[in-house]
C-alpha cells in the first residue's frame, strides 16, 4: 500500500498542495514551525479521520476558511482508490472513489497509517490518557467494529456523566433512567475492552520480536492491559465483562453520585509495559523507553499487515534526531523497503545516507512545499 498523490486546501498553515510521492521514502526538510508536522497530520487525518494532536477538528481549519479538504490516491495490491475527507464547522464528510460514506467507520481502513512522533516517547512514563489514545487510534483503523464501539462508548459515557451531574445537583431523581444508561455504557464498554484484549495479544508477539531486534538484548517485552474494574481478565467474553462492570457499578454507586462522574470503564483503563516482568514505568532507562515506543510502532505495522494483507504507510515526525544511528538502522531495516515512509527533519545530516539512499526530498517554508532536485548524497534524482 502506498500514497502516490496528495492534495489539500484549508488545512492549518499549509498552502494549497498537489504533491506526488515516492513509493518508498519521502523526506520533508524545514525549520521548526514551518508546517512539517501539519503536513504529516494532514496525511494521517486522510487515513484515519482523526488527528493525533487534537480532538477538536475545527482547530485544523485554516484561519479565515470555512473548511479543509484532503484528498489522495492510494495504490493497493488489488486496486487503486481515490480518498477524500472534508472538515467543516458542522463535522466531517468522507468519500471513497467519489462515493460519500454513510459513516466514518465505513471510510477508515482504506488507507492505514502509523505515525511516530516525539510525543510517543512518553508512552511508557506519560499519562494513562496517552496510552488509551494509542489504543483507540491504532485499533480503530484496523477494525470498523472497534471504531463503532469506541464512538458509541464516548457518547453514552457523556450522557451518563451528564445525568450523574443532574442527580448530584438534585435536578433529576430518576434512578431507573440511570440504570438504563449504566446498562448501555456497560454493553459498549464490554465490547471495547474485549477487542482491546484481542488486539493486544497479537501486538505483544510482534512487539517482543521488534524489541529484541532493535536492542540486541534478550529482555522480554510484554504489554499488559490494566482494566479499572480489576475483576476483568483476558479470558472473559463480552457478556462476562459486562456483568463484572455492572457488579462494580452497583458497588460504587454512592461514590459516583458524590463525584458526579463515571469512575470505571475503558476511559479509565491503562496499559503496563514490562521488561522481564518488571514495570518499565518504574525501572526502564530512557534508552529502553525509546526502544519500547519504537517497538510498539513496528509491531503495529506487523499487526496491520497480518489483518489486512497490506503494509501501512509510516509517518516519522521529527523522530530520527531522537534515535541514535543503531536505532535508525534497526527501524529502517525492520521495514525493509516495503513500507512507504514519510520523514520530517530540520537537518538532513540526522538521517544516515547509508540507511536512506535516494529519498524524494521536499523543502517546507511557511506552509509552502517544493521538491528538492537532489538526493541526500547530492546526486540529481
UniProtKB/Swiss-Prot annotation:
Gene Ontology molecular function, alphabetical: ATP binding; single-stranded DNA binding
A biological-process GO annotation: SOS response
Keyword Membrane appears in the UniProt entry: no
Keyword Hydrolase: no
Localization, UniProt: Cytoplasm
Major subcellular site: cytoplasm
Listed transmembrane segments: none
UniProt GO cellular component terms: cytoplasm
Family the entry assigns: Belongs to the RecF family.
UniProt function note: The RecF protein is involved in DNA metabolism; it is required for DNA replication and normal SOS inducibility. RecF binds preferentially to single-stranded, linear DNA. It also seems to bind ATP.
Protein name: DNA replication and repair protein RecF
Species the sequence originates in: Lactobacillus delbrueckii subsp. bulgaricus (strain ATCC BAA-365 / Lb-18)
Gene that encodes the chain: recF
Amino acid at each position: 500500500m502506498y500514497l502516490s498523490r496528495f492534495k489539500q486546501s484549508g488545512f492549518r498553515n499549509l498552502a494549497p498542495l498537489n504533491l506526488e510521492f515516492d513509493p518508498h521514502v519521502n523526506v520533508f526538510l524545514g525549520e521548526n514551525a514551518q508546517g512539517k508536522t501539519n503536513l504529516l497530520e494532514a496525511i494521517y487525518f486522510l487515513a484515519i479521520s482523526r488527528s493525533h494532536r487534537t480532538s477538536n477538528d475545527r482547530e485544523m481549519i485554516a484561519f479565515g476558511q470555512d473548511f479543509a479538504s484532503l484528498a489522495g490516491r492510494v495504490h493497493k495490491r488489488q486496486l487503486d482508490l481515490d480518498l477524500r475527507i472534508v472538515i467543516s464547522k458542522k463535522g466531517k464528510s468522507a468519500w471513497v472513489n467519489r462515493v460519500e460514506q454513510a459513516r466514518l467507520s465505513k471510510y477508515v481502513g482504506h488507507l492505514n497509517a502509523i505515525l511516530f512522533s516525539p510525543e510517543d516517547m512518553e508512552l511508557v512514563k506519560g499519562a494513562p490518557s496517552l496510552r488509551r489514545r494509542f489504543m483507540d487510534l491504532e485499533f480503530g483503523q484496523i477494525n470498523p467494529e472497534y471504531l463503532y464501539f469506541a464512538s458509541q462508548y464516548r457518547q453514552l459515557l457523556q450522557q451518563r456523566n451528564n445525568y450523574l451531574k443532574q442527580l448530584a445537583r438534585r435536578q433529576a431523581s430518576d434512578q431507573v433512567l440511570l440504570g438504563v444508561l449504566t446498562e448501555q455504557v456497560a454493553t459498549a464498554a464490554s465490547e471495547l475492552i474485549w477487542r482491546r484484549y484481542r488486539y493486544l495479544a497479537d501486538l505483544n508477539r510482534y512487539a517482543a520480536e521488534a524489541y529484541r531486534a532493535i536492542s540486541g538484548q534478550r529482555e522480554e517485552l510484554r504489554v499488559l492491559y490494566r482494566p479499572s474494574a480489576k475483576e476483568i481478565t483476558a479470558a472473559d467474553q463480552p457478556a462476562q465483562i459486562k456483568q463484572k462492570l455492572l457488579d462494580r457499578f452497583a458497588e460504587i454507586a454512592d461514590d459516583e453520585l458524590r463525584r458526579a462522574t463515571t469512575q470505571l470503564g475503558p476511559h479509565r483503563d491503562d496499559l503496563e509495559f514490562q521488561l522481564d516482568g518488571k514495570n518499565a514505568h518504574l525501572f526502564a532507562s530512557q534508552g529502553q523507553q525509546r526502544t519500547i515506543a519504537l517497538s510498539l510502532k513496528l509491531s503495529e505495522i506487523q499487526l496491520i499487515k497480518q489483518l489486512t494483507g497490506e503494509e501501512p504507510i509510516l509517518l516519522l515526525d521529527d523522530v530520527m534526531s531522537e534515535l541514535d544511528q543503531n536505532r535508525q538502522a534497526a527501524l529502517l531495516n525492520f521495514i525493509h523497503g516495503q513500507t512507504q515512509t514519510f520523514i520530517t527533519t530540520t537537518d538532513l545530516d540526522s538521517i544516515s545516507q547509508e540507511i536512506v539512499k535516494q529519498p524524494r526530498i521536499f523543502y517546507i517554508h511557511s506552509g509552502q512545499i517544493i521538491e528538492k532536485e537532489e538526493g541526500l548524497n547530492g546526486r540529481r534524482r
